[in-house]
Amino acid sequence: MDEQSQGMQGPPVTQFQPQKALRPDMGYNTLANFRIEKKIGRGQFSEVYRASCLLDGVPVALKKVQIFDLMDAKARADCIKEIDLLKQLNHPNVIKYYASFIEDNELNIVLELADAGDLSRMIKHFKKQKRLIPERTVWKYFVQLCSALDHMHSRRVMHRDIKPANVFITATGVVKLGDLGLGRFFSSKTTAAHSLVGTPYYMSPERIHENGYNFKSDIWSLGCLLYEMAALQSPFYGDKMNLYSLCKKIEQCDYPPLPSDHYSEELRQLVNICINPDPEKRPDIAYVYDVAKRMHACTAST
């Protein structure tokens, strides 16, 4: 459910202005208590609006999902159960899930507003300037991302959709990992219809073989993201590439090496062990986080 916020900064939305009486007893659990201001993003299955709570003035992101059209009853129940899990996460580098409720035949999810750019925008900026991201900057952001994922995995929650567009960076340089992958709850028929939207460069070999997603699949995506921060493109990116040739490249771990004259052996080695076709041979998040902390400490002073 990636959110494409670029080009979505439209005029203020008026048709969603609450007309119902305020319900202080309901808190964040009803649309009546929100003023919706403008659309800020759109995903395959959802639209995201900037809104503010009329009870406390807090700005939020309100994600509206067409839940009844896109899910069967079991998937709806599983999705809501998963969101309840996400609400238990509490970490400075994870977008906070405040509330979720079904109203007007839609699933409404109230999230912390990430009023910031994202990592994909930062990568595009460096690419446009024909400059590589300094290694100390890579570790500054990557260590925060590892901290977020360590928190999630310690609570047995997988992200499932780690990629630069889902990593937000605030004006003060704080990383916020957002848009946790709830897409698996949508019907296979619906998902198939959307499978050509965006090339799945971060898809792990086990996903290709439909062997299911596990915690080590998040590590694969994390390795791809670290590579992309250094190379300014996905490890498996190729011009005019179809899905078949992409899957072949992923299965064979066929990607160009990072420049050794610009990035440390430690960074290149970490990428290599994360992007391993065998999930069992990939490290866990605790190991990746330890390396990131050590490298952040020794590059921050340079």
Swiss-Prot record:
Keywords: Acetylation, ATP-binding, Cytoplasm, Cytoskeleton, Kinase, Magnesium, Metal-binding, Nucleotide-binding, Nucleus, Phosphoprotein, Serine/threonine-protein kinase, Transferase. Residues 20-33 are annotated as: NTE motif. The modification Phosphoserine is found at residues 5, 195. Binding to NEK9 stimulates its activity by releasing the autoinhibitory function of Tyr-97. Signal peptide: none annotated. Its cofactor is Mg(2+). Disulfide bonds: none annotated. It catalyses: L-seryl-[protein] + ATP = O-phospho-L-seryl-[protein] + ADP + H(+); L-threonyl-[protein] + ATP = O-phospho-L-threonyl-[protein] + ADP + H(+). PROSITE patterns: PROTEIN_KINASE_ATP, PROTEIN_KINASE_DOM, PROTEIN_KINASE_ST. GO terms for cellular component: centrosome; cytoplasm; nucleoplasm; nucleus; spindle pole. Disruption phenotype: Mutant mice are viable but are born at sub-Mendelian ratios. They further suffer from severe growth retardation, infertility, abnormal gait and slight paralysis of the limbs. In an experimental autoimmune encephalitis (EAE) model, mutant mice exhibited reduced disease severity relative to wild-type mice, as well as reduced recruitment of lymphocytes, monocytes/microglia, and NK cells to the spinal cord. SMART domains: S_TKc. Protein kinase which plays an important role in mitotic cell cycle progression. Required for microtubule nucleation activity of the centrosome, robust mitotic spindle formation and cytokinesis. Phosphorylates EML4 at 'Ser-146', promoting its dissociation from microtubules during mitosis which is required for efficient chromosome congression. Phosphorylates RPS6KB1. Acts as an essential activator of the NLRP3 inflammasome assembly independently of its kinase activity. Monomer. Interacts with NEK9; interaction takes place during mitosis; it relieves NEK7 autoinhibition and prevents interaction with NLRP3. Interacts with ANKS3; this interaction alters the subcellular distribution of NEK7 by preventing its nuclear translocation. Interacts (via N-terminus) with NLRP3 (via LRR repeat domain); the interaction is required for the formation of the complex NLRP3:PYCARD, oligomerization of PYCARD and activation of CASP1. Displays an autoinhibited conformation: Tyr-97 side chain points into the active site, interacts with the activation loop, and blocks the alphaC helix. The autoinhibitory conformation is released upon binding with NEK9. This is Serine/threonine-protein kinase Nek7. It comes from Mus musculus. The lineage of its organism: Eukaryota, Metazoa, Chordata, Craniata, Vertebrata.
